C-alpha cells in the first residue's frame, strides 16, 4: 500500500506527462468540504480526483461533490489506483 501523498504525486506525474494540467488542493478551514485532492484539465475536460489509500473510504460530502461534478459534465473519481486515472485519460483521448 502506498501512502496517499505518493499516490497523489504519481497521478500528477501521469497527467502532466500526457500534456495535462493539475494541482493538488490542500484542504483547510476555508475550503469547501468534499473538495477533491487533485483538480485537473486534460484536453479541455475537467477532472477531479479524490485520492484514498486502499483502506480509505470516501466521506459523504466527497460523494456529493463527485456527483455534482459529473452532473455538470466533468469527470470525477475516488481512487487509490493510478490505472483508474489512466483509464479516464484514455477515454478522453477517444472522444
Language-model segments: residues:
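Catalytic phosphate/metal-binding cores of nucleic-acid and nucleotide-processing enzymes, i.e., regions
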Residues: 1-95
Amino acid at each position: 500500500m502506498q501512502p496517499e501523498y505518493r499516490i497523489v504525486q504519481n497521478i500528477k506525474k501521469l497527467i502532466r506527462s500526457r500534456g495535462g494540467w493539475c494541482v493538488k488542493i490542500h484542504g483547510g478551514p476555508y475550503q469547501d468540504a468534499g473538495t477533491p485532492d487533485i483538480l485537473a484539465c486534460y484536453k479541455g475536460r475537467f477532472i477531479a480526483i479524490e485520492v484514498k489509500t486502499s483502506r480509505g473510504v470516501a466521506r459523504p460530502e466527497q460523494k456529493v461533490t463527485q456527483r455534482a461534478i459529473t452532473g455538470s459534465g466533468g469527470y470525477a473519481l475516488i481512487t487509490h489506483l493510478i490505472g483508474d486515472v489512466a483509464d479516464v485519460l484514455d477515454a478522453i483521448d477517444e472522444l
